[in-house]
Amino acid sequence: MSTFPKRILLKLSGETLIGNQGFGIQQQACLQITKSIQQIQQLGIQLGIVIGGGNIFRGINLKANGMPRVPADHMGMLATLLNGIALQQALISLEVKTCVMSALDCPKVAESYQWSKALQYLEEGVVVIFVGGTGNPYFTTDTAAALRASEIQANLLLKATKVDGIYNQDPLKNTQAVKYDRISYSQVLAEKLQVMDATAIALCRNHQIPIFVFNMKRLFENRLDHVLTDYSHGTLVDDGEIGHEANKLDR
């Protein structure tokens, strides 16, 4: 691409904050990620971030063990608040202007999400970290990312994952899985490709927000700018070419 998007929504899983400790939040991992975020901000790009909470808690796990879905999801949403605060403090240590806006009211630790205020912050160059998911149970943080991207009129949604794009099968389980360079929203939905849930994909399609799926390792290599200049580093989801396949995994 010849120019950078004006405004980006970056979706991070809670797992990006684990580092090498297997659970929770590792400060070094936070600092490495925030260096990539700082790099993007220095390009003049307005940046919003939605972060998951799976490194701390997954509501769906408690539901499987008998807890009602609603309180289980509330606990998962609160986990994203912890991650957001950790990310905010790491950004502050790099002197990056940032704020945490929560879909759940926790006024002593985060601002309540307000659409107009979020837009104002973005225009002022503040990195806005959106936590609390959508504020409602039964919705994933991927859906929250698509919702916030739609609300702030993001030009691109970046999703960091464990693999370097979208494959026709799980590449962590099948070494013959084939990667797509580019694929349409409709094909992702039709083939039920497990990159984001269907609600999130449909929201992005309805609001014409391209999705770029890339390997979270780029965040730790300070190479997020490469992702924005060369789409071969992942998979682009939009209404363009129907997915053509890239090379098989070299393993």
UniProtKB/Swiss-Prot annotation:
Biological-process GO terms, alphabetical: 'de novo' CTP biosynthetic process; UDP biosynthetic process
Q: Where does ATP bind?
A: K11, L12, S13, G14, G54, R58, T161, Y167, D170
Q: What is its main location?
A: cytoplasm
**Where is region (Involved in allosteric activation by GTP) located?**
19-24
EC code: 2.7.4.22
Q: Which SUPFAM superfamilies match?
A: Carbamate kinase-like
How does this polypeptide assemble, per the annotation? Homohexamer.
Output the Gene Ontology terms for molecular function.
ATP binding; UMP kinase activity
Q: Which domain of life is it from?
A: Bacteria
Its function, per the record, reads: Catalyzes the reversible phosphorylation of UMP to UDP.
Pathway field of the UniProt record reads: Pyrimidine metabolism; CTP biosynthesis via de novo pathway; UDP from UMP (UMPK route): step 1/1
Residues annotated as binding UMP are G53, D73, T134, G135, N136, P137, Y138, F139, T140, T141
Q: How is its activity regulated?
A: Allosterically activated by GTP. Inhibited by UTP.
Q: Which organism is it from?
A: Protochlamydia amoebophila (strain UWE25)
Q: Which PANTHER family match?
A: URIDYLATE KINASE, URIDYLATE KINASE PUMPKIN, CHLOROPLASTIC
Compartment annotation = Cytoplasm
Is Kinase one of the keywords UniProt gives this record? yes
Identify the keywords attached in UniProt to this record, alphabetized.
Allosteric enzyme, ATP-binding, Cytoplasm, Kinase, Nucleotide-binding, Pyrimidine biosynthesis, Transferase
Enzyme class, one word?
transferase
Name the CDD domains on file. AAK_UMPK-PyrH-Ec (cd04254)
User: Which reaction(s) does its UniProt entry say it catalyses?
Assistant: UMP + ATP = UDP + ADP
Protein known as = Uridylate kinase
Can you cite an annotated GO cellular component? cytoplasm
Which family is this sequence assigned to? Belongs to the UMP kinase family.
